[in-house]
Design a protein with these regions (language model features):
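C-terminal regions of mature proteins
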Residues: 9-12, 127, 159-238
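Acidic/histidine-enriched alpha-helical segments
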Residues: 17, 37-49, 103, 117, ...
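Short amphipathic alpha-helices in soluble, non-transmembrane regions
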Residues: 22-28, 137-144, 238
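Helix N-cap motif at beta-to-alpha junctions
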Residues: 14-19, 130-134, 231-233
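Short helix/loop capping segments that flank catalytic or ligand/cofactor-binding pockets
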Residues: 20-21, 33, 73-76, 236
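PPIase-associated folding chaperone regions across multiple families
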Residues: 78-81
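Non-catalytic beta-strand/loop surface segments
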Residues: 1-5, 27, 31-74, 88-136, ...
């Protein structure tokens, strides 16, 4: 019921025609049953903001955190995409990395990312730190969540993120396997083939007022839940 022909997405890149590809797919996948298979249903997030600790005897703690995100077809998705880049989606150039890693030395890496699922979208992040410092790292993340929701981003941050996202995009297409993976992802998300031509324009079209309005709507500090695995010191479940 999960693996059915009507639910397949196939992309082929290289010196091959549809006529040549068809028989190969028939041989490889022809025995799969017909039909649409199981469909996901919308999920209501039952978990509330707070902290869950999973005890594990390790020298450092790893935390995953997040709350509800945004649909891929939402009009504000690209504003959310740029916002996440500024918050924690650009490695050491992000706000969280500047505050948690560079200024305080609490971690080697902290990041955030948009998780796009058909019926369960999330804005998530992760960080790892020593058991006696993970509490401080979490406090800084929460503070930056509140700060960005309240104050938004600057014009310079927006421009820098747009330049990075649009400039790095062509580098994803440097091999057949990568291109095929991108095309399958586009199919799964219901995007047209023209998306590749319009994606950068839509990123550059995000305005400061739009992204700051969205920051206040999307970022919900009170809903942020942390799951910490390790033996963190000074933290209690909420």
């Amino acid at each position: 019921r999960l693996f059915v022909r009507d639910a397949l997405s196939v992309s082929a890149v290289g010196d091959i025609s549809a006529a040549d590809l068809g028989p190969m797919l028939d041989e490889l996948l022809g025995d799969l049953p017909a039909g649409e298979g199981l469909k996901a249903t919308a999920v209501d997030f039952a978990i509330e903001g707070g902290l869950t600790i999973v005890d594990m005897p390790t020298p450092q703690s790893v935390a995953l955190f997040g709350h509800a995100g945004i649909d891929r077809d939402h009009p504000d998705f690209f504003a959310a995409y740029v916002l996440n880049t500024i918050l924690g989606g650009r490695g050491v150039e992000s706000r969280l990395s500047a505050e948690v890693r560079e200024k305080r030395g609490l971690t080697y890496g902290v990041s955030t990312f948009l998780v796009g699922k058909e019926e369960a979208n999330m804005l998530m992040g992760q960080v790892a730190s020593a058991n006696d410092r993970i509490g401080e790292a979490i406090a800084v993340i929460r503070h930056e969540w509140i700060k960005m929701a309240r104050d938004g981003v600057t014009e310079a941050e927006l421009t820098d993120a747009q330049t990075y996202l649009t400039g790095a995009y062509p580098l994803r297409f440097d091999g057949n396997a990568k291109i095929a993976n991108i095309l399958v992802g586009m199919q799964r998300q219901g995007l047209s083939t023209n998306y590749i031509n319009t994606r950068n324009d839509r990123i550059n079209a995000v305005t400061l007022s739009e992204i700051n309005r969205l920051a206040a709507e999307l970022l919900k500090p009170e809903a942020l839940h942390f799951v910490v695995v390790g033996q963190p010191k000074g933290l209690n479940e909420e």
